[in-house]
Every structure is written in C-alpha cells, then in structure tokens.
C-alpha cells in the first residue's frame, strides 16, 4: 500500500534510532530476532549466528515478541525452505544469480554460499544504509538500494550479468504490499528474465481480513497489517503468459511438534491453507 511514514510511538521503541522510513521495514528486526532465538535452541532447524551478532550490536529490546510461537516457527520454516531452494539453485545452475528482494538484515549469503554464483541483496535505500553497517557487500554478494517496483535495477542486473540465469526470492514481504504493485513487479520480471524462478510466500484473503489474529502483527498497531492475499494457486498465471505455477508448500503441515496447540488451527477452514510458500517459473520463451 502507500508508504507509511515513520512515527515514533510506544510500540516502535524496538527500532528507535535506526531511521527506517517505512514501518514494514521494521519487520526485518522481528525476523532477525526469531532467527536468533532459533539459533540458541538445542533442537534448532536453522543456524544463523549473524542474526545473534547483529541483535547484540543493535541492543534493541525485542522481549515483547519472546512468546510469539506461531510467528517464530513460521519464520523459521520459511527461512529453511528459501535457504534450501537457494542452495539447490547455486549447486545446479551453471551461472546463477539469486536476488533477495526486501532482504532486510537477513544474511542468506552466509548461510548458503558454497563458493559459486552471485547473491544480490536489495531493499529500500534507508534499510540498505543500516544493512551496510553490519553486512558489507562483496563482489559475489553485491547490494542495491532501490524499490523492488522500479525497473532500473532489473536492467542493471541484466547488463552486469549477461548469460546468467536469475532467481528471485521475496520472503515475508508481499502480504504487506499493494496487489497492483505486486502484479506490476511480476510482469516486469516475467518480461525481462526468461527461465527465472520466483520464490515467495503468501497469505490467503481470509488471513488478510483477519490479520489482527496474527500474534506478532498485533503488536504493531495499525501501521503494519496484511494487505494482499492469494487464494487460487494459479491466479498469478493470469498476469503474464510467461508466469507458470510450479509448487506450493504449506507451513502448518511441517514440524508439527513445534507448533504445539497451534496445529488445531488446521480445523479452521481459513487457517489450514492460509499461509503458503510458492514457486513460480518464468517460461524460457518469454520475451518483452
């Protein structure tokens, strides 16, 4: 939706002094916290020592999110899937470029790099300024400060990496955006990157209507809420002939022991398939 201008209030103290202009960017701190929490568990599903390190340096108090079990487990399941997809792409493709859109303070490069391919981190300029303090760019892990809805960076990547194959990861971001903007983004990608893979997560329109049920979203008041939902898995195919649905994975079917009582949410029709992770491919023949 519209850009939410930064305003300080009681619920925002976690990000005081970081200068994020858009409230959505604050959720970068939340995912960082959940990954740090996971790293300290003996039965951890992912390991992210960099998240622990950055949180310590920031010195922000995230304790009000300590018991947000559903959000924490969901974040880790999502991170694990996108890490796994990134590793597969880097291993299997000849000249891969993986672009992390709205990367926040996530260091997927550290978790997944095996010495081959390029991973590009992109987020809004104010977020990237903060990111640089903790995660400096490198030749195989460059950074771009831009809106994902612009096309300049897309053309720049095509110029910088000719003969490469691209994958785009959009983690934990689309549900906060405007549907028309997302459609434009997917169309712009489809027309420029034939053969690319798109990996993203989405919530249903039922979840959008009930976003205050989300245990972490509640903490942010009205500045952060779900605005875009996807119901039909193939709905996005209608946006461009090059877009093809490949697969879906549902959160709630995984790591049942970690969800605890929350598995009962499967009984609520809107919840069972309310949160999902998808892969779309851009057909090889697609061209502007």
Where are these regions (language model features)?
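Rossmann-like AdoMet
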Residues: 5-99, 103-146, 151, 156-158
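Short "lid" loop at the C-terminus of a central beta-strand within the Rossmann-like core
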Residues: 149, 175, 203-208
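A conserved beta-strand element that flanks and buttresses the S-adenosyl-L-methionine
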Residues: 168-169
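A short, conserved alpha-helix within the catalytic core of class I
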Residues: 176-188
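Conserved beta-strand signature within the Rossmann-like core of class I S-adenosyl-L-methionine
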Residues: 192-205
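Short, glycine-/aromatic-enriched active-site segment of Class I SAM-dependent methyltransferases
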Residues: 208-224
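Short alpha-helix
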Residues: 224-250
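Core SAM-dependent methyltransferase catalytic element
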Residues: 258-288
């Amino acid at each position: 939706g519209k850009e939410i201008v930064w305003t300080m209030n009681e619920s925002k103290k976690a990000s005081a002094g970081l200068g994020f202009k858009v409230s959505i960017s604050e959720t970068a701190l939340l995912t960082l916290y959940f990954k740090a929490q996971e790293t300290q568990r003996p039965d951890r599903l992912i390991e992210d020592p960099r998240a622990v390190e950055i949180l310590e340096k920031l010195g922000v108090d995230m304790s009000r999110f300590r018991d947000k079990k559903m959000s924490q487990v969901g974040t880790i399941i999502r991170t694990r899937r996108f890490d796994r997809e990134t590793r597969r792409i880097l291993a299997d493709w000849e000249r891969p470029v993986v672009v992390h859109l709205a990367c926040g303070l996530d260091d997927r490069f550290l978790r997944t790099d095996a010495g081959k391919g390029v991973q590009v981190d992109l987020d809004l300029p104010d977020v990237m300024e903060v990111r640089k303090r903790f995660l400096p760019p490198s030749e195989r892990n460059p950074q771009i400060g831009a809106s994902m809805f612009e096309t300049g960076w897309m053309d720049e990547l095509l110029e910088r990496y000719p003969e490469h194959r691209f994958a785009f990861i959009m983690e934990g971001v689309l549900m906060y955006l405007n549907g028309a903007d997302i459609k434009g983004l997917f169309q712009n990608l489809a027309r420029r990157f034939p053969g690319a893979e798109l990996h993203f997560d989405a919530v249903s329109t039922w979840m959008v209507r009930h976003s205050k049920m989300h245990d972490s979203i509640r903490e942010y008041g009205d500045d952060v809420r779900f605005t875009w939902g996807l119901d039909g898995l193939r709905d996005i195919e209608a946006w461009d002939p090059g877009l093809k649905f490949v697969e879906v994975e549902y959160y709630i079917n995984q790591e049942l022991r970690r969800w605890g009582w929350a598995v009962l949410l499967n009984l609520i029709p809107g919840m069972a398939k309310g949160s999902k992770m998808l892969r779309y491919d851009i057909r090889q023949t697609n061209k502007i």
